[in-house]
Amino acid sequence: MTNDTDTMPIADYLAQGGKLTSPENVPPRYRGELLRLMSSFVDSELAGSAGFAGAINWAPGIKARIAASRITLEKADHAERVLDLMEGFGTDKALYERAHDWAAREGRDSTLEAKRHGGDMRLSVFHYPLTGWTDAVVMNVLMGLATQHAVGELARCSYQPLAEVLRDILPREKRHMELGLEGLERIGATDEARASVAYWMPRVAETFGPAVSERFEKQRAMGLRHTDNETLRSAWRAEAESVLSPLGLC
């Protein structure tokens, strides 16, 4: 389905659940918000992949090494799929990939607000470094659960090509979380695991954004978002606690 500006204003069309299907029929303000969402996803996947690459050599066995390698590879692939969509809006893909040091991190004890830092659009959680295998596994589980909610939200967006790509990506992102959970079950309720949960829970929670957000309201009016930040965060927190509690980690 495409917009038909001859029959109704684009804002009304989107408010009624209309879908846009190509860069050519996207109005300027919509384009800006859409590119912001896509850039945040691409940058977060690239930063996540680059940061998790180091975990491959921390893996305690062959299966764990394969799992870490798979996560690293597929997150980069997910970034490329959405970056391919951005090319249609004039983004120089080759230049974009080289624009930032995706493995760069701040200090472990840095205090970062949820807003963007540096030149890229990664979520703030991807500015913090991993310290070892247990820490990487805990972060992967918590962020993997968050991704199910956040990307699941965007998979319903009004820009149909992005929604379709994200629906294809979601099962693999879920599998990444499941691989992490398998690793966490093997690690068990150690002091190190509990410390990592305490460290990452508030930082992952911040990725959903402020409880009251003018940007969310703007994106909801465009059909790019549907569920508010606090509702998504609460759903994630409840699911995270249900996963961690049987393991003695919350």
Annotated model-derived regions:
Residues 54-66, 149-168, 182-195, 215, ...:
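Inter-helical turn/loop segments and adjacent helix faces that build the functional surface
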